[in-house]
Every structure is written in structure tokens, then in C-alpha cells.
Amino acid sequence: MARERPPGRGCGVLRRCLLGAVLLFGLRLCAELRRAGPGSPTRSAPPGPAWRPPGPHLPPAPGQPRGASRRQVTYVRSGRRAPPGGGGSGTPEPGCCAPRGRPRRKGPRWHIDLQPWAGSAQSLDEEAWRFLRYISTTQIACNHMNTDSLATDSSPTHKPWSVCLDDRFNLAHQIRNKQCRLYSLGLGSDDTHFEVSMANNGCEVHRFDPSVKSAHILESQHLWYHRLSIDWRDPHPAVAAQKPHSNTRKLGSILNEFGHHKIDVLKADLESAEWKVLENLILEDVLEQIGQLIFEIHLHWPGFEVSGSDSSVVRFWYSLLKELEQKDFRLFHSYKDLSKPQLFLKKDIFNASSCYTLSWVNTRWK
């Protein structure tokens, strides 16, 4: 005779099967969620605040404000790609960045390309002769120099600050149309005949001199004086925060602050700071905004923050000038100042002067 099952036993087995199936489904669902990760929901999330998974969240590290980690990562990345004119560190100040609609074409360069040694001996004699020959040999002919034919003031200039007025380089046309702009970088020089002459011819002239008493002075209709010193670096952010009106800037920063995109003529007499300033103009592609360069160079010592053996210093100088040539600047005038000490790196050698005035024209300038 068959045994009867206890009441409800079959239902119990069924319940256990159902519970097991539910448990298995739950475990699988958890595994899928873990595999997907917290970032996957953001792919389909609508625009707006970032999606955050429900539940408790870890607090930020001690001393770190909420959301700071995300902002810091974004800042570092954008800082590396930022144009070098912004100073390279710290929160950008108003006017420090390139104008809208004018994106930088290249990333920043950190050093110039050194030219090969002049000879296998890597000696001072080899480097000096190559350099002196280079600065004494013009690369392009200019038939009309200076502003004598246009100037209302016929007195002779005190120094040979020569500009090229050949029609093919457009400066004479800009002067006649009162549309030229001159930047003059100096350190307390009383010789302003060149600036006054250019202003009298209708050029917009900005002279930067840290010895000026007021921040900005309008000397005449077209001549401005600014109490600013052009450097090869912007002030450190900590210093800038304490002195928001610091009078030291890179030329690229000045251009951005003034809203100027082009300089027809850049004249510089920086008393041995010219090498580092020129290096900065090269590395940050500011040269593309300049039509003609007139630099007084000093050779009696290496210059500010230029170091190394004598031969390596001269090689650095030569490499800077070759960078100008590679950017389509051509030397059209060279003046050897015999009134200055005849010294070359503190030595009376090579029949060299300690001071030369060199003028270049940007052959691609329009």
C-alpha cells in the first residue's frame, strides 16, 4: 500500500526552487552592475550635472574642498596646452590670453635649436669668427632706410636706429597712411629722437621704460610712455598676487593686454637683457607679429641668465640669430659702435666692439 506524502511537502520544494532562482538572478544582476562600472551610466546621461551613483559617498581628503580633485586635473591639462604668453602658471589674469578667434597654431617650445659647432675644436676663436662675420654681413639690400625723407624733424639721429622703407616691405606705406605701430623697449635712455621722429610721421609709438614716473603718459598725439619693463618671463604668480600692478611683463603678455596683434617696428636697447628677451620672442612665436626688428646687442659679457663656457655662449648667440633667419627675418643693416669699449666677453680680442646695432626685416610681413 503506497505511503501518503505529508501535507505541504511538495509546495516546500517548489518554494525552495523559486527562492534559489531569485537569488541566482540577483547575484548575476550585481555582477553585471559591477562589471559595467560607475562610469557607464554617464554615457547615456543627459547634459547637466555629472551623474553620481546613489548611496553614500566618500568625503574629500582633509584640507581638500569638494570637487577640487576634478578641477585640478582639468587645470593641469589645459595649462600644458595653454599658449605660452599666459605665463605658464597660476590662474590666468584678464588680458593674459590670446584674443578670441586667434588660436595658437603650435604648442610651446622650451629651448631653441642650437646650431652645430663652428669647428671640431669647439673653441672660442672658431665660434667668435663665425658669429662676428654673421652680424657684419647684411643678408638683404635695403635702398631706403630711416625716416629722413618723411620726417618733419631734420636733425640727425643720435643712434643708427635704421628701418627699411622699401615699398616691398610695406612700412613706408603704413607710415604714409598713419597706420604704423612702433614698440620701443628701453631702460632709462634719454635718446628718444627715433621715437619722436616716428610719432611725428603719424606712427602710434609706445615706449616702455620702468623709470617713467607715471603708469601711462601721453606725451604727444601719437607718443605714449608706459612704466613697464619687458622681460623674458612674467612675474611669479605669488609675486603677482601680492603686486597686481607689477611693472614687469613679457612682450606677448603686453600685446594681449593692449589688444595689439601687430607691431610694425620693435626697437630694443635692453642693456644685455636682449638675448633672453629675443629667445622668448622666438620660443613663443611672437616674432610672427613683428615687421622689423632693431636690436642693440652687447658682447662684453654673456648677458643676463646666459651661462657656460665662452665658446658655448657665442654658439648660443649665433643660434638665436639663425632662428631669426629661419623665421624669414633678414639682416639689412649692421652698425659697429666704435665709441663703446672694444671688448668681446671681457677680452680685447677679434677687433670687436662691445656693442652693435642690428636691423632685420620680416620678408613675409604684410
Curated annotation (Swiss-Prot):
Q: Pfam families in the record, alphabetically?
A: Methyltransf_22
Q: What is its EC number?
A: 2.1.1.-
Which superkingdom does the taxonomy of this entry point to? Eukaryota
Can you name one GO molecular function term for this protein? methyltransferase activity
In Gene Ontology terms, what is a biological process of this protein?
methylation
Question: Signal sequence span per UniProt?
Answer: 1-29
> Bias category Low complexity: which stretches?
91-100
Under InterPro entries, the record lists: Methyltranfer_dom, METTL24
Q: Which UniProt keywords apply?
A: Methyltransferase, Secreted, Signal, Transferase
Q: Which family does it belong to?
A: Belongs to the methyltransferase superfamily.
- Purpose: Probable methyltransferase.
The protein here is known as Probable methyltransferase-like protein 24
